[in-house]
Amino acid sequence: MARKKEFRYRGYTLDELLNMSLEEFAKLLPSRQRRSLKRGLSPEQKKLLRKIRLAKKGKYNKPIRTHSRDMIVLPEMVGMTIHVYNGKEFVPVEIKEEMIGHYLGEFAMTRKVVQHGSPGVGATRSSMFVAVK
């Protein structure tokens, strides 16, 4: 039987990451994210973190919605569903262990893939000779 491999971030288990302070955790992150945390969280990010902590305790039962696409996924967010704004709507993002250290905005795409229809009459030079239905 194949066991699921235990998740580790830079050699630390999720439990060890949860017991770390924000400063200790920041030392494990890549430089861009580390510098972002070192500068401190913005008021919007602090508000989001407060909502997440309330929701973990069961005191906040509305869906957590945010415009903070630049918020770094922290270990305490794992298991939560956060609705991230993509410029048009709030996209539900289920936070998994593998997402730790990434930005929330990476998981809510701002552009959708263009699916072109068939070209219309006059779209090309050869379509001049096609009979119009």
UniProtKB/Swiss-Prot annotation:
GO molecular function, one term: rRNA binding
GO biological process, one term: translation
This protein's record includes keyword Cell inner membrane: no
Annotated keywords: Ribonucleoprotein, Ribosomal protein, RNA-binding, rRNA-binding
GO CC aspect terms: cytosolic small ribosomal subunit
Signal peptide positions (record): none
Entry annotated with the keyword Mitochondrion: no
The protein's role, per its UniProt record: Protein S19 forms a complex with S13 that binds strongly to the 16S ribosomal RNA.
Assembly, per entry: Part of the 30S ribosomal subunit.
Family stated for the protein in its record: Belongs to the universal ribosomal protein uS19 family.
Protein name: Small ribosomal subunit protein uS19
Taxon lineage: Archaea, Methanobacteriati, Methanobacteriota, Thermococci, Thermococcales
